[in-house]
Amino acid sequence: IIMENTGATLTGKASVDKPWLQFYPEALRNVEVPTITVETFLRAKNPDENKIAFEYYGNKITWKEFWGEVDKAAKSLKILGFGEENRIPVFLQSVPAHFILLIAAERIGAAIICRDDIPEELCFAIRKSKSETAFVMDYTSKSDEDLFRATTPMKRVIKVSPYDYADRKSVPDYVEKEIASRYTGAIETTEGDLTWDEFLALGKDYTEDYMAQEDANRPVFGAYTSGSTGISKLVIHSSSNIVATAFQMSIFIPPSDVPEKWWLPILPPALIAVTVSMAIFPLSAGLIMVLD
């Protein structure tokens, strides 16, 4: 049997024949998906480091600035003892720090583990990560933090504020009202806790080579996802998985001489769909990511 339009001989196995390709333009039928790291992919797609990568409440972050923050974060992760094969619990909304941590983890050969759930389920994720450090939003309550410390190996919390990387004067009143509503319980800073800026400062004197050997098939991002099959399950993604997903969508975005933007509203929890389909994809297509 010969497939119409492509002339390919059919085997009867959809995974081999890929019959859907007959409906694609010829130029796209045999596109090869690159097996590269997320950072290599984004750099290739955004060679001009003076171009804006993110807009966040009045602050424009260029690619040069973004890579600089990644460098700081990677060094600080090494100071905290993270390295290859380690898992880093990261429970953040879609704020700039999340994307910085993703690439920083990739550089040192680690993986970030993300979850948005009840405190007990977050504790489970920390225990499975076997990590003494977790990254959380700074409105995490004292009772939740106490639970983390009592039931997991966690000894240190890095607290990220919604205002980190924002121009506070540019934040609309309705957004400030929403942010304020997140601080519902008692909040306490325990000895050893750090702000995001304090975390970045940890590695300022780090001079060793922190880069792990580049491996696109190494796990870099894990997210607990659920649906109709019961409790949330951890799904691990390698750099090449993420690149493949973003690449196959980005090829449909034509180049533009005019800076185009991709709006990600309500700062949703940074799980897999948000991170890859709603962020890495538009960034790889050369769009400016507006986090709002």
Q: What does each model-found stretch correspond to?
A:
Residues 117-151, 243-264:
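Conserved ATP-dependent adenylate/AMP-binding module captured primarily in the ANL superfamily
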Residues 159, 177, 181-224, 231, ...:
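Conserved pre-ATP/AMP-binding loop-to-beta segment of ANL
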Residues 89-91, 98, 102, 106-137, ...:
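Short beta-strand->loop structural element characteristic of the AMP-binding/adenylate-forming
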